[in-house]
From Swiss-Prot:
The keyword Ribonucleoprotein applies. Residues 7-19 have a biased composition (Basic residues). One of its GO terms (molecular function) is small ribosomal subunit rRNA binding. The gene is rpsT. One of its GO terms (cellular component) is small ribosomal subunit. Belongs to the bacterial ribosomal protein bS20 family. It comes from Marinomonas sp. (strain MWYL1). This is Small ribosomal subunit protein bS20. Keywords: Ribonucleoprotein, Ribosomal protein, RNA-binding, rRNA-binding. Pfam families: Ribosomal_S20p. GO terms for biological process: translation. Binds directly to 16S ribosomal RNA. Residues 1-22 are annotated as: Disordered.
Length: 87
Protein backbone atom coordinates (compact mmCIF):
# COMPACT_ATOMS: atom_id res chain seq x y z
CA UNK A 1 0.00 0.00 0.00
CA UNK A 2 1.28 3.43 -0.93
CA UNK A 3 2.05 5.59 2.10
CA UNK A 4 3.48 8.87 0.90
CA UNK A 5 1.60 11.34 -1.26
CA UNK A 6 4.04 10.81 -4.11
CA UNK A 7 3.69 7.05 -4.08
CA UNK A 8 -0.11 7.36 -3.98
CA UNK A 9 0.01 9.60 -7.04
CA UNK A 10 2.32 7.17 -8.87
CA UNK A 11 -0.13 4.35 -8.08
CA UNK A 12 -2.99 6.37 -9.59
CA UNK A 13 -0.92 7.16 -12.67
CA UNK A 14 0.07 3.51 -13.04
CA UNK A 15 -3.58 2.49 -13.23
CA UNK A 16 -4.24 5.03 -15.98
CA UNK A 17 -1.13 4.19 -17.97
CA UNK A 18 -1.80 0.45 -17.71
CA UNK A 19 -5.25 0.92 -19.23
CA UNK A 20 -3.88 3.18 -21.96
CA UNK A 21 -0.98 0.84 -22.77
CA UNK A 22 -3.36 -2.12 -22.93
CA UNK A 23 -5.49 -0.24 -25.42
CA UNK A 24 -2.47 0.57 -27.60
CA UNK A 25 -1.23 -3.04 -27.50
CA UNK A 26 -4.67 -4.24 -28.51
CA UNK A 27 -4.69 -1.82 -31.44
CA UNK A 28 -1.30 -3.06 -32.65
CA UNK A 29 -2.44 -6.69 -32.38
CA UNK A 30 -5.52 -5.85 -34.43
CA UNK A 31 -3.41 -4.36 -37.22
CA UNK A 32 -1.14 -7.43 -37.19
CA UNK A 33 -4.18 -9.70 -37.45
CA UNK A 34 -5.40 -7.73 -40.47
CA UNK A 35 -2.10 -8.43 -42.23
CA UNK A 36 -2.31 -12.12 -41.34
CA UNK A 37 -5.90 -12.30 -42.59
CA UNK A 38 -4.89 -10.77 -45.93
CA UNK A 39 -2.00 -13.22 -46.21
CA UNK A 40 -4.29 -16.17 -45.45
CA UNK A 41 -6.68 -14.94 -48.13
CA UNK A 42 -3.77 -14.87 -50.58
CA UNK A 43 -4.30 -11.23 -51.50
CA UNK A 44 -0.85 -9.68 -51.83
CA UNK A 45 -2.07 -6.14 -52.56
CA UNK A 46 -4.27 -6.02 -49.46
CA UNK A 47 -1.55 -7.67 -47.39
CA UNK A 48 0.99 -5.06 -48.50
CA UNK A 49 -1.38 -2.18 -47.72
CA UNK A 50 -2.18 -3.63 -44.29
CA UNK A 51 1.54 -4.25 -43.70
CA UNK A 52 2.36 -0.57 -44.23
CA UNK A 53 -0.21 0.47 -41.62
CA UNK A 54 0.82 -2.27 -39.20
CA UNK A 55 4.52 -1.40 -39.37
CA UNK A 56 3.73 2.25 -38.68
CA UNK A 57 1.69 1.38 -35.59
CA UNK A 58 4.26 -1.17 -34.47
CA UNK A 59 7.15 1.29 -34.78
CA UNK A 60 5.25 3.96 -32.86
CA UNK A 61 4.47 1.47 -30.10
CA UNK A 62 8.15 0.47 -29.95
CA UNK A 63 9.18 4.13 -29.74
CA UNK A 64 6.82 4.60 -26.78
CA UNK A 65 8.29 1.57 -25.03
CA UNK A 66 5.26 -0.69 -25.35
CA UNK A 67 7.35 -3.21 -27.26
CA UNK A 68 11.08 -3.75 -27.42
CA UNK A 69 12.50 -2.54 -30.73
CA UNK A 70 13.79 -6.03 -31.52
CA UNK A 71 10.33 -7.50 -31.04
CA UNK A 72 8.88 -4.94 -33.44
CA UNK A 73 11.64 -5.72 -35.94
CA UNK A 74 10.97 -9.45 -35.59
CA UNK A 75 7.26 -8.98 -36.31
CA UNK A 76 7.99 -6.81 -39.34
CA UNK A 77 10.57 -9.23 -40.70
CA UNK A 78 8.30 -12.26 -40.41
CA UNK A 79 5.32 -10.49 -41.95
CA UNK A 80 7.46 -9.18 -44.79
CA UNK A 81 8.75 -12.69 -45.51
CA UNK A 82 5.19 -14.04 -45.59
CA UNK A 83 4.10 -11.32 -48.01
CA UNK A 84 7.08 -11.95 -50.29
CA UNK A 85 6.25 -15.67 -50.29
CA UNK A 86 2.84 -14.84 -51.80
CA UNK A 87 4.45 -13.50 -54.98
Amino acid sequence: MANSAGSKKRARQAVKSRAHNGSLRSMVRTYLKKVDAAIEAGNQADAQAAYVLATSKLDKAADKGLYHKNKAARHKSRLSAKIKALA
